[in-house]
């Protein structure tokens, strides 16, 4: 499958998401290692339900497939959602569905690409993420890029006999200094 190269980095590029990969995304969404981190572990996600969800993802937001630059393979999804153009903010959601591509810096680069888009194309000033206290990989990724923790909802999620906080982090446009888009304009 040929993907469009909307935002291009060294390790990955972002291609507008649609329902063509519903089978693959449904497999990822039903993978326990993915769904436990996204909070969707109890959701019953069929291919048809995933297709319907993917078809609506770009309504009121921007959704992209994360594509590995080495082999043009879709490995995850990243999106801006709950966008307020009045208050110029949004929520970012992301996962690397293919476990062979985790811990290689691709998630970091994909996050930087979508933040560049958020701040320098659609002119947002604040982007927030919501994750869980056990998801140290996501928390560390966000801290490395410049996100700051802004609050917690204590004991918000229960898995087995374990309770975990929901962690809220955000980044302002003034905290983000890695723009590919601004370089293109020079």
Locate predicted features.
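A short, well-structured alpha-helix characteristic of acyl/acetyltransferase catalytic modules
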Residues: 1-51, 175-186
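Conserved catalytic-core motifs of GNAT/GCN5-like acyltransferases
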Residues: 128-131, 148-164
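Acetyl-CoA-dependent GNAT
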Residues: 43-100, 172-174, 184-185
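Short glycine/proline-centered loop/turn elements that form peptide/ligand docking sites
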Residues: 107, 111, 135-138, 155-160
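Conserved GNAT acetyl-CoA-binding A-motif
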Residues: 120-130
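Conserved acetyl-CoA-binding loop-helix of GNAT-fold acetyltransferases
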Residues: 103-117, 140-144
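Active-site acidic-Proline motif in GNAT/NAT acetyltransferases
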Residues: 98-100, 104, 133-134
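Conserved active-site tyrosine of GNAT-family acetyltransferases
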Residues: 142, 147, 169
């Amino acid at each position: 499958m040929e993907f469009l190269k909307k935002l291009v980095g060294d390790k990955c590029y972002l291609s507008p998401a649609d329902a063509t990969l519903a089978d693959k995304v449904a497999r990822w969404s039903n993978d326990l290692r993915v769904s436990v981190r996204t909070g969707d572990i109890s959701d019953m996600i069929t291919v048809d339900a995933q297709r319907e969800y993917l078809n609506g993802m770009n309504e009121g937001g921007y959704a992209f497939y994360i594509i590995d630059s080495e082999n043009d393979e879709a490995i995850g999804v990243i999106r801006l959602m709950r966008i307020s153009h009045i208050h110029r903010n949004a929520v970012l959601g992301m996962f690397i569905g293919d476990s062979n591509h985790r811990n290689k810096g691709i998630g970091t680069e994909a996050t930087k690409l979508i933040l560049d888009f958020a701040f320098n194309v659609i002119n947002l000033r604040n982007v927030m993420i919501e994750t869980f206290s056990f998801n140290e990989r996501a928390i560390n990724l966000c801290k490395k890029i410049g996100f700051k923790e802004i609050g917690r909802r204590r004991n918000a999620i229960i898995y087995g006999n374990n309770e975990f906080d929901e962690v809220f982090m955000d980044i302002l446009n003034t905290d983000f200094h890695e723009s590919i888009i601004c370089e293109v304009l020079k």
